[in-house]
Amino acid sequence: MKPTILLINFKDQQKLRKLKMALLPFKIRLKTVESQDYCQPIGYLAGVKEIAKVETASTEILSALIPQEQMEKEMLILAGITGNLFDQVLYTLRKAGTPVDYKAVLTEHNQNWNCMQLYKELEKEHQMYHP
């Protein structure tokens, strides 16, 4: 899998552009995830070959069950980015002035989750550390 950053729920196009420009030198795949794909496994969205796309009929059912309006904040998922590159990416995001409250790393544990499942988990963690 090529190092990838998934960009989810970015409504501010200027902020999204600034973030993409800041990350351009790293030659990392940046993928803006559209709301119709929020029910797909994040591993699939990041390009993990072993994770299959959810079928269309299932997608429509899941979309009905996942209220997108509940996703209020932006979310950034780092996949296949480790070590020094990971540190450099986070430093660059901070330096560029493009804060993203909800950040996650793709893991074996969460790669089968959809965007909303991960969002809810990050929301719980955020509330725990920032009451």
Feature map (PLM): residue ranges:
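N-terminal, charge-rich interaction modules
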Residues: 1-53
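Helix-rich interaction surfaces within compact, conserved domain-sized segments
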Residues: 4, 15-21, 25, 86-131
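Structured loop/turn residues at secondary-structure junctions
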Residues: 10-11, 81, 110
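Noncatalytic linker/hinge segments flanking ATPase motor cores
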Residues: 45-51, 77-79, 115-124
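Mid-chain, well-packed structural core segment of small domains
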Residues: 63-96
